[in-house]
Every structure is written in C-alpha cells, then in structure tokens.
Curated annotation (Swiss-Prot):
Protein name according to UniProt: tRNA(Met) cytidine acetate ligase
Keyword Ribosomal protein part of the UniProt annotation: no
Source domain of life: Bacteria
Family under the similarity heading: Belongs to the TmcAL family.
GO BP: any one term: tRNA modification
Keywords assigned by UniProt, alphabetized: ATP-binding, Cytoplasm, Ligase, Nucleotide-binding, RNA-binding, tRNA processing, tRNA-binding
Residues that hold ATP according to the record: 7-20, 96, 152, 175
PANTHER family (UniProt xref): TRNA(MET) CYTIDINE ACETATE LIGASE
Keyword DNA-binding listed: no
GO molecular function, one term: ATP binding
C-alpha cells in the first residue's frame, strides 16, 4: 500500500487541508508543527486539537515536528520534516502549491548539481536575504520563475530539495481558493490567515472549517498573549546573542526598538530589513520568547495520534524507528517541552501539553 507523507501546520485546519487529505492516497502520515509554527508565531490552537482535526478528516498518523524543525526557514523546515517522514516509510509526498511545477525534475536537478548550486548561493552578495539567494539559485539552475508572494510555492521547492535522492515521489496539487495570505471571505476555500483573522465570525468559520465547533470551543492564542513576556525577555536578558540566531546587530536593533512599540508586529516592522526578513525576525522573537539555544534534534519521533491503519503502520516500523507515545514515561525533546510550557502561559484554559498525554485515537 502507498504510504503518503504530508507536511503541515493546520493553523487552523480548514477545508483546503481536508481537500489535500482526500486527494492523498494510501496510509496518510502527517508531520505537523507543534505549538509554534514556521513563520514564527504561536499556533492559534494547540497541537493536540489540530492533530484531532486532522485525524477526524482523513489522516492516519500525526507526528510532531520538534521545535527546531518547526520554527525554521523553508529549507530547514522541509529537510527536518522529510527526514522524519522518510524514517516512517513514506514513498510519496503530497503538498499544495500555488503553481504546479515538475517538482520531480527539480529534485533530480538538485540531486545532480547540489554542490554547484549551494556554492552559487554562497557566492551571492551578503546583503541579500537567504530566501532571495535561494530564489536566484532556482531561477538559474531549474528555470523557475518567481512571481508575487507564494510561500507554498517556495515550500514546494524546499520539499523537492529535501526529497532529492531519497526515492520519494512528489505529488503537488494546485492550491484551492484563496492564496496563503489572502484575507478574502468571498472564496470557495478560505486561507488559514483569513480564518485566524475572522475567528469571531462563526458563520464564516462554520463554512470553511470541517471541525468548526472544536475550533471555536478550544482555548486560542496569538502573539498578543505573549507580548509582555517577550518584552520582559528582551529587556532582562544580559546577552541576547546567547539565543539561537541572534547576532550583535539583531540584539542591538531589538534593544533599541523594544521600548518604542506596543505590539509584536510593530517590533517586527522596526527590526526587519532587506537582509532580515519579517519571517526571520518573527522566528528570532519566538526563539527569544522560549529561551532557545542551539540544540540537537531528537532522534525519536513523538506521536500525537493515529487511526487504526496508522497504528498498524506504527507497529510495522517500530523496530527500526524510536517512537515516543507518552512523554511522561520517556523523555523526548527538552526544547520542545520548554516551548510548550511557555505556550501554556498564553491562555489559562490551555491543558498540559506533554506529561500524561497519550496519542489521540480515532476509528
């Protein structure tokens, strides 16, 4: 049977995600971000709620991306997620994209010319951001044309790069409805961004989310819930450069700006430059919030939930893969658990995120 991997955040889970799961074939394994997501912000509802949403709509197995995989630039995010999925035995990767390209050929190009391509990236001017450098790399070596703001398209290329040489078939599907950052409400499929913005509009949420009641009754958070704690962390840390990816320039810009702002977005706007993108700054703020220092990734894989098919698949791979089903009995990743403790501070109604929690089971 085909084993399909899906890399996701489900922030929150919506009809477009259900469409993706319906399209995927065989056993469907989701590698999902935990309580903090790739663009550098807390997930609107916790990882257990989002895993339940996925399992109730077609996923067979949901595993958690460790913090240092989930909150990273596209290449590291994709590489870490693909590594986890490949260890779980996937033979194909299904993902949504704004533009369906021949990602398989692109992966082959990278497999053949990776050293030359990475050397090209290193040769580009330092005032370019890393995303700008990788775009130039894909333009030169694979003839990819970049138009507009298409994060799923960029992630698709990162997936192709991560899957190169691994024997994984790439199955892109055209993104349905609104664009990734679209706020439009008059669409066939609303974006996660729009759903987060209009979360108080119950009719809108009901229309575009298959698990709308679960979403609406679950504790929710945003950056606003952590703003004061973030400011405290910046003001009281004597050496911000001890935090992952914080250099002297970023530390100086943060210290200068933090007393002049009243929201996280204002801080991002003041600190971001051409070289330091807003997404990168948000990730750095997330690292500061949770006190992240450089840390190795866990070798084991944390399971959030499974269907009967997913449970059978887990049994078939457990001899070759170290699986953690209950963190209280077996340690997993201390940084992710630390981040989860901080996440819980955002809403007093949030449940314990690790100790005593067992995988969600659906029939």
């Amino acid at each position: 049977m085909t084993v399909t991997g899906i890399i996701a955040e489900f922030n929150p889970f919506h009809n477009g995600h259900k469409y993706l799961l319906d399209y995927a074939e065989g056993i469907k394994i989701v590698a999902m971000s935990g309580n903090f997501v790739q663009r550098g912000e807390p997930a609107i509802v916790d990882k257990w709620i989002r895993a339940q949403m996925a399992l109730e709509n077609g996923a067979d197995l949901v595993v958690e991306l460790p913090f240092f995989t989930a909150v990273q630039s596209a290449d590291y995010f994709a590489s870490g997620a693909v590594d986890i999925l490949s260890r779980l035995g996937i033979d194909s990767l299904t993902f949504g994209t704004e533009e369906v390209l021949d990602y398989q050929t692109i992966a082959d190009v990278y497999s053949e010319k990776s050293e030359e391509m990475e050397a090209f990236v290193e040769s580009l001017p330092s005032d370019l951001s890393y995303p700008q450098k990788t775009q130039k790399m894909w333009e030169k070596f694979a003839g990819v044309d970049f138009t507009g703001n298409t994060p799923n398209h960029i992630l698709g290329l990162a997936y192709a790069k991560a899957c190169a040489g691994k024997g994984i078939t790439l199955n892109p599907i055209q993104r349905q409805g609104a664009g990734y950052h679209s706020l439009d409400k008059k669409v066939s499929f609303a974006s996660a961004t729009s759903l987060r913005l209009h979360k108080e509009d119950s009719d809108f949420v009901d229309k575009f989310m298959p698990n709308s009641k679960l979403f609406q009754t679950s504790p929710q958070v945003s950056w606003d819930n952590y703003f004061q704690l973030l400011v405290y962390q910046i003001l009281t840390n004597p050496d911000l450069t001890s935090v992952f990816q914080v250099n002297e320039e970023i530390a100086s810009r943060l210290k200068a700006a933090v007393r002049e702002i009243s929201s996280v977005e204002e801080l991002v706007d003041k600190v971001a430059t051409k070289r330091y993108t807003k997404a990168r700054v948000r990730r750095i703020l997330t690292y500061i919030l949770v006190g992240a220092v450089d840390n190795s990734l866990p070798k084991s894989i944390h399971v959030l939930g499974f269907s009967q098919k997913g449970q059978f698949h887990l049994k078939s791979v457990k001899k070759s893969v170290d699986i953690v089903a209950r963190i209280g009995r077996k340690p997993w990743d201390m940084l992710t658990q630390q981040a989860d403790n901080v996440y819980q501070l955002g809403n007093p109604e949030l449940c314990e995120q690790n100790f005593g929690r067992v995988p969600i089971r659906v029939k």
